[in-house]
């Protein structure tokens, strides 16, 4: 890889003229400065079922079920929850069929979001969990980055620790990126918040602030607008 996460990001970053991008019918495409666009496995406007009503369909190369203890799945594991999906090399599910630990190139996809992690701890009933050592893509926000930990606290909220965030094309040195101790992305409000933040331009730090609030979608807000970075 020429930059961290290249193998993962290249799966979902496509040319705007490609058949995959055209399936979005012009929705969620990045700015005119970018030739490419993110296309994730589950579209941002895909219908989902409420966590307490969703059923899980599970497949794997090998499975072992123990009604008195943990159950194990190994090899091409897929857990499909009607609009949400986990893929992993290995998954352990507890006796109550509530908590799952997934390991090995774990991909979690839902409504325009996809991540790849070393491992995750996931509640199958609430569909919340913690992801460790992750790369992530947010299609609707044209964004990507990496994080030591991602906490999925609700369908609409992600909390990232020691993370980066950029809306530039994936590259070794993106035109700009935010690096922060904590990043909170709230799709319901359309805002992102960061703590102990540095702004990098071409991998050079140009600004450091203790707190930063920025839009993650196209909704209009009052107050100071964050800058839009362009390049030629």
Can you annotate each of these PLM segments?
Residues 1-232:
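Structural signature for solvent-exposed beta-strand/loop edge elements and short helix-capping sites
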């Amino acid at each position: 890889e020429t930059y961290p996460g290249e193998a993962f990001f290249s799966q979902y970053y496509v040319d705007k003229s490609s058949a995959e991008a055209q399936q979005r019918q012009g929705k969620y495409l990045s700015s005119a400065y970018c030739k490419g666009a993110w296309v994730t496995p589950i579209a941002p406007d895909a219908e989902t079922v409420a966590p307490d009503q969703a059923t899980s369909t599970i497949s794997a190369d090998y499975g072992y079920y123990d009604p008195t203890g943990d159950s194990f799945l190994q090899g091409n594991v897929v857990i499909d929850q009607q609009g949400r999906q986990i893929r992993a090399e290995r998954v352990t599910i507890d006796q109550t069929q509530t908590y799952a630990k997934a390991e090995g190139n774990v991909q979690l996809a839902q409504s325009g979001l996809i991540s790849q992690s070393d491992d995750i701890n996931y509640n199958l009933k609430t569909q919340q969990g913690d992801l460790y050592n992750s790369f992530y893509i947010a299609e609707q926000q044209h964004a990507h980055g990496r994080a030591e930990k991602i906490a999925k606290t609700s369908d609409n909220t992600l909390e990232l620790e020691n993370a980066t965030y950029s809306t530039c094309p994936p590259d070794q040195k993106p035109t700009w990126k935010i690096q922060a101790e904590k990043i909170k992305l709230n799709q319901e409000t359309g805002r992102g918040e960061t703590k102990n933040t540095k702004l990098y331009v071409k991998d050079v730090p140009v600004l450091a602030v203790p707190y930063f609030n920025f839009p993650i979608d196209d909704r209009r807000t009052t107050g100071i607008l964050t800058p839009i970075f362009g390049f030629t």
